[in-house]
A protein has these predicted regions:
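Long, low-complexity, polar and repeat-rich extracellular regions
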Residues: 1-263
């Protein structure tokens, strides 16, 4: 097993980076990164199958058949794939099948890009939490392949999420939960039998929540839910047959939130 570990710390004006360690035996690669500080750039590229960018524990599951799954824990010392700081740039590219990536970002003005090419890959991203908001962060996710899954959870304000499934990408799952004011979510999907869940929660702010879905394909299941005290905007354009689309908006908490079910 190849292992790659990076520990990056920025304390005041001092920048310390641990050595990259790679052992050349065959098998899955594991990357576990902990970064503390501002204005850093992390670029990770994995080619092959069953590779892992690690951290933030394991679990998730759903089904019947709102699908999901995940159950990754592996990379360590003690798990990692975290960023604490602002104005950082993270780029993850995974090419292959059955890869996984989990990241937790706390801070503002960070940029996260995930590019997944292959089948049966799983990616989970968290920005902010109940004690730390993530402000003005940008998330860009691109999927090319089948049966992939991406989960994004964001707490904070003025965050943007953009997900693209390229032509011929089928049976994928995207779940965006944004507990934030002034959130923008954009989905561009070309493929069939995909599941998309988008939920925007919290006071919408003067500009409101915004969600744009552009769907080309058949048998896709799309559920969007927005709640907040101010304006919300949903722009939905679909081309194809047998798609199921659920749109719910409310000025208060949505009772019994729905989940997209596979067609």
């Amino acid at each position: 097993m190849n292992k790659l570990k990076s520990l990056i710390s920025l304390v005041a004006l001092m920048f310390v980076t641990s050595a990259w360690a790679v052992d050349a035996t065959t098998g899955p690669n594991s990357v576990y990164v902990e970064q503390i500080g501002n204005t850093n750039t992390v670029t990770i590229e994995q080619v092959g199958g069953t590779n892992t960018v690690g951290g933030t524990g394991g679990s998730a599951t759903v089904d019947n058949t709102g699908a999901t799954t995940l159950t990754v824990t592996a990379p360590s010392t003690s798990n990692y794939a975290t960023i604490n700081g602002s104005s950082n740039t993270v780029g993850i590219t995974q090419t292959g099948s059955s890869d996984s990536a989990q990241y937790n970002i706390k801070g503002s003005n960070n940029s996260y890009t995930s590019t997944v090419t292959g089948n049966s890959n799983q990616t989970k991203l968290s920005i902010g939490n109940s004690t730390t908001n993530g402000l003005r962060n940008t998330v860009t996710e691109t999927i090319t392949g089948n049966s992939n899954m991406e989960i994004t959870n964001i707490v904070g304000s003025d965050n943007n999420v953009s997900t693209t499934m390229n032509t011929g990408s089928n049976s994928n799952q995207v779940t965006n939960t944004v507990t934030t004011s002034n959130a923008d979510i954009t989905h561009t999907i070309s493929g069939s039998n995909n599941i998309v869940n988008a939920q925007q929660i919290d006071a919408a702010g003067s500009a409101g929540h915004s969600l744009t879905n552009t769907i080309t394909g058949n048998y896709n299941s799309i559920t969007t839910q927005q709640q907040g005290t101010n304006d919300t905007t949903i722009n939905m354009a679909t081309t194809g047959d047998h798609n199921t689309i659920t749109v719910r908006t409310s000025s208060s908490a949505i009772a019994s939130p729905a989940t997209a079910i596979a067609r």
